[in-house]
Each structure stands twice: as structure tokens, then as C-alpha cells.
């Protein structure tokens, strides 16, 4: 029901006369992690993950009625997600492993935006949903210098979806500098060789991005 209301609002904005629209290039840095839960407390204590620094790059289309600060944004973004991992547990596996898991997604975000103009400077906030498709992935274990290419068993294994929100500043209606928090809702668990397996894993990304509008 909520998604229907979002699409209805976007359709209403598109049909509004005097629509002001811009196409832009978006680039940024991702600080990605995975939220994991384990069924055993000792495994949970021995396994933890930190942020993986990645990238995002793509196109965005922003539109709003000229007499209103409310509008929408849609994009096509290449986004690198994943996490670093550290496993040190003598009780469970008598081993130490460190490395990172990397997933490269093509994402389509759909956001409602509100912009407040203050002369040549503007501030904006947004929120919405996204859908992603994993193009490739790998797990690198640095302690053993091995790389495992991610194998996706089905189309659904490549999919990710969730919500995002953020805010930023805009200069001359051309340059936008902002931050975004993205939280996945789909369980993206996949096997990592010789490591304990979580019961659930979802993507979380904090990104800092720059947009140039034409």
C-alpha cells in the first residue's frame, strides 16, 4: 500500500505543468558493511566485520514542479558493497582468517526529494526505495591469499532491495554534495569457505556523494 502511494505521488508530480528536470552524473565513496546474525554465541563472538570502502558511479534524473520544492529522483548506479571480516576462534575452528567480501551491484534508486532554496544555495533531503542486481562478487581471504568468485545459483540470488534516505547541500542548482544511508531488506547470505555461516546478512551502506547536474 505504501509503495502505491509513492508511485501515485510521483505520477502526480510528473503530470504537473511547469516541470523542472535535470540529468546528472553521480559519483561517491561507499562505506559498506553487512549486518549479520549467528545462531551460536561463541561464533558470534569470534566473527565480526567492519566497513569495506567501495565506490558508486552512475546517472540520476531529478524533477520537480518549478513552483514547488517537492520532487522525485530516479537513477542507475554502479555500487560496490560488502564488508571486511575477521575470524579468530580457537574454540570453534582453531583458526585465524581475515579478508573481505565484495559485491558489485547495478542499482535503481527511486526517491522523493524536498529542496529548500536559500539564494544560490539550497538544502535538500530525500527518502525512498532501491532495487539492485549483483553483476559480480568475490571473497578474498588475505591470510591465505585466496580468492573465491561469488557463484549465484539463481536470478533471485543476485537481487537486493531496501530503503535509503539522506540529505545534502546544493550550489547554483548544479552541484550537490550529500550523504546517504542505505539499508538492505533482503537476506544476502552466501557461503564463505571455511568460515562460520550467519543465519542472516543484509547490506548496509553509508555513502558520501557528489552530483553534477546538466
Regions found by a protein language model. Give the residues of each.
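Outer-membrane beta-barrel "beta-signal"
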Residues: 173, 200-214
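Transmembrane beta-strands of outer-membrane beta-barrel pores
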Residues: 29-33, 63, 78-82, 107, ...
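Outer-membrane beta-barrel strand-turn architecture
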Residues: 19, 63-67, 116-119, 171-173, ...
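Glycine- and aromatic-enriched membrane insertion/assembly motifs of diderm outer-membrane
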Residues: 24, 40-95
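Residues that define the transmembrane beta-barrel architecture of outer-membrane proteins
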Residues: 51-55, 102-108, 159-163, 202-206
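Repeated loop/turn-to-beta-strand initiation elements of outer-membrane beta-barrel proteins
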Residues: 23, 68-72, 120, 173-179
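Short glycine/proline- and aromatic-enriched beta-strand/turn motifs that initiate or cap beta-hairpins
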Residues: 21-62, 120, 134, 143, ...
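Flexible, solvent-exposed loop segments that connect beta-strands
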Residues: 34-49, 82-103, 135-157, 187-201
Amino acid at each position: 500500500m505504501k509503495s502505491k502511494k509513492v508511485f501515485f505521488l510521483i505520477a502526480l508530480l510528473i503530470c504537473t505543468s511547469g516541470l523542472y528536470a535535470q540529468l546528472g552524473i553521480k559519483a561517491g565513496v561507499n562505506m559498506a558493511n553487512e549486518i549479520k546474525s549467528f545462531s551460536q554465541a561463541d561464533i558470534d563472538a569470534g566473527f565480526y566485520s567492519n566497513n569495506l570502502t567501495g565506490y558508486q558511479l552512475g546517472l540520476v534524473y531529478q524533477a520537480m514542479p518549478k513552483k514547488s520544492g517537492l520532487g522525485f529522483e530516479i537513477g542507475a548506479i554502479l555500487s560496490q558493497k560488502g564488508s571486511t571480516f575477521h575470524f579468530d576462534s580457537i574454540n570453534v575452528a582453531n583458526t585465524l582468517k581475515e579478508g573481505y567480501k565484495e559485491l558489485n551491484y547495478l542499482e535503481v534508486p527511486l526517491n522523493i526529494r524536498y529542496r529548500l532554496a536559500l539564494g544560490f544555495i539550497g538544502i535538500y533531503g530525500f527518502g525512498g526505495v532501491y532495487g539492485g542486481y549483483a553483476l559480480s562478487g568475490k571473497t578474498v581471504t588475505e591470510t591465505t591469499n585466496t580468492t573465491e568468485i561469488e557463484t549465484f545459483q539463481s536470478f533471485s540470488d543476485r537481487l537486493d532491495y531496501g530503503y535509503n534516505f539522506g540529505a545534502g547541500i546544493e550550489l547554483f542548482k548544479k552541484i550537490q554534495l550529500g550523504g546517504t544511508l542505505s539499508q538492505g531488506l533482503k537476506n544476502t547470505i552466501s557461503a564463505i569457505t571455511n568460515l562460520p555461516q550467519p543465519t542472516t546478512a543484509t547490506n548496509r551502506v553509508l555513502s558520501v556523494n557528489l552530483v553534477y547536474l546538466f
